[in-house]
Amino acid sequence: MPVDVEAVVLSNTRLPGGYSVLELRAPELASLAAPGQFVMVRASHCDAPLLRRPYSIFDLVRDADGRASGFTLLNKRVGVGSGLLYEAAPGARFCCLGPLGRPFTLAAPPVEAWMVAGGVGLAPFATLAPALAGRGVAATLFYGGRTSADIFCLDRFEPHGVRVVIA
């Protein structure tokens, strides 16, 4: 069941090419999230943009006890809404509705998985990679971008044994 929460920005890491990784504290939402799900996000402090924007959950943040305490979003600054996320400072608040969408389902027993992504399309696979590794699945990520600035965060996949192919 989705929840509507006000998430607090803990950090905002800028990446090349106008990308950023936003870490949000929202334990009630994070504890319900599964690989492949997304949230609808809107700035709490303003009416523009009027509509929420969908963002795949990039990663789950865990506290010292291993409980999900928040999540990260992968963002590319393009318009007003993504610009607000890109400029967000620690302590900023965003309205988040989620988790939404059907999580990834794994065939039983999966032997091999291929993931194909480019740019921010990488986000849902960051939570899938450890789930695949935990089931002993050999995974390959085919990843592309328009420029070298669109290739990032590959370090999130290597610890899980994911073979990365840059297209």
Language model regions located:
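Ferredoxin-reductase
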Residues: P2-P90
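FNR/FR-type flavoprotein reductase catalytic core
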Residues: V80-A167
